[in-house]
Amino acid sequence: MFTYSSNECGAGKTRAIINYLNKNPSTKGILVQNTMALMTQSSQSLTNCKVINTNTSTTVYEDIIEYIDSPTNQVLVISDKMFWKVGESIKAGMYEVFVDDSTSHIEHTSITEDNTRAKGIVQYDILSNVQQIPNTCFSTASIKDSKDYGDLMKDLTKKFDIVRNNDACIFNTSWLVEEETTKMAITAYKNLTKYSHLDIHFCANNFEQTLIYLANKHFFVKKDLDGIMTRTVPVQQRLKVFYFSDSDLSKSWKDKSQDELAKVYRYLNKVLPPNSFYWTKNNADSYKVDGVERFELAGHFISCDTRGINSMKGFDTCVWLACLRPSSTEIKQYEHLFGISGDELLRAREQETLWQFVMRGCIREFDSDKVQTVYVFSKEQAMSISTNIEKIELDITEKRKNGRPVGSTNAHILPDALNTRLKRFLATNPALAEFITWRNEKCKGISIADSKVMMTRFEKRQKKGGAK
């Protein structure tokens, strides 16, 4: 079993861990943190520690392995990325491990490619053990050893490090078998059972809503840290939130509505004095007119992921124009793997990241009553932060309501002969590889639409458990 504590941003979680370790010099500890800056900051307060990261070593993995077998200091400070790599090698009972504000053992990425030859290279030369998951539209796979590959193949294989660096993964089968599917969505994760022999304490804001907790509730028992601070003024009394749209913000809306989004940027650049606020947007947000970037504000830009940043406390205003909403495929993969709902994923992904971003400002000071002003795009984002919200009317065109697009056509129907052949073959309960081979060899010359319908029929049969 692991222990955890759940305390709000700025409550002194890191300080409490450091105080515990300094007061118990005979305790061997490992402090796991997610930024170089935080690791350096913590090392300055720890009485007897060693930091091993890319700033202090050229052979990080090897040095950590050597240290955990023969420690030279009381406390080892390492990154969360390295902890997941070496954790299985740490001996039981030797260390108390503190995972500070690192809240996910899951990774998700997408790869966009429509070239069928490239897809074939991925399927046959990079991935191995591709297996369709019964009753789903997903497959699992591992990755082949690339040590004998040339430079080009090694570079291509690096695109799939998410598979190599985790214990298991799933992806949408359609990317391999449907020409018109251009995006491969991969979700991969660490198996926490590998670390169950260790004494690990996790701490974070709203830990019960983090992905690592939601996916592994059976592993965790709550245990509070000593010395946690309390606010003099409740956080909700210190927030004023403005928003611009009643519709949810999405990447597709940004791509299609750049002129509408530009209205928000123009307004904020008009009302906010330069350098009086910190702000963020998605890395992909860019819209240049005559070489001038329209999606730019005159504040202090920081990334969306702000865990560990303590240098924004002098600002009383911040702007969040990012969108971190999960895709429908990602939601389905999380539901299948961990039983995590779309709402839970949205809360853990976008809304918690937004909350962390807001908590970098003056509101981080617990003994202050100063109000922090926050600007976000959507009402949904605003309501996830506070009830004290107000809409700024900029005449932004809202999203269309869901419904069948004008001019859409009826579903594609297979020719009778092909439909009969497909029924007969599906009755044999083929595996994914058998189905692909049959379709490619026995159904040459079929259209993309036919191929897509056949794959959909195969997946539906898999979900039903095959023929009775």
Can you name each region flagged by the protein language model?
Residues 49-84:
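Inter-Walker segment of RecA-like/P-loop motor cores
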Residues 77, 85, 105, 298-384:
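Conserved RecA-like P-loop NTPase helicase motor core
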Residues 91-128:
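SF2 helicase catalytic motif II
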Residues 2-17:
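Walker A/P-loop
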Residues 399-412, 460, 466:
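Arg/Lys-rich, glycine/proline-spaced intrinsically disordered segments
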Residues 27-35, 200-204, 268, 275-283, ...:
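Conserved RecA-like ASCE P-loop NTPase motor core of nucleic-acid helicases/translocases
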Residues 16, 20-21, 25-47:
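Conserved Walker A/P-loop ATP-binding site and its immediately adjacent core
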Residues 117-275:
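Interdomain helical connector at the RecA1-RecA2 junction of SF1/SF2 helicase-like NTPases
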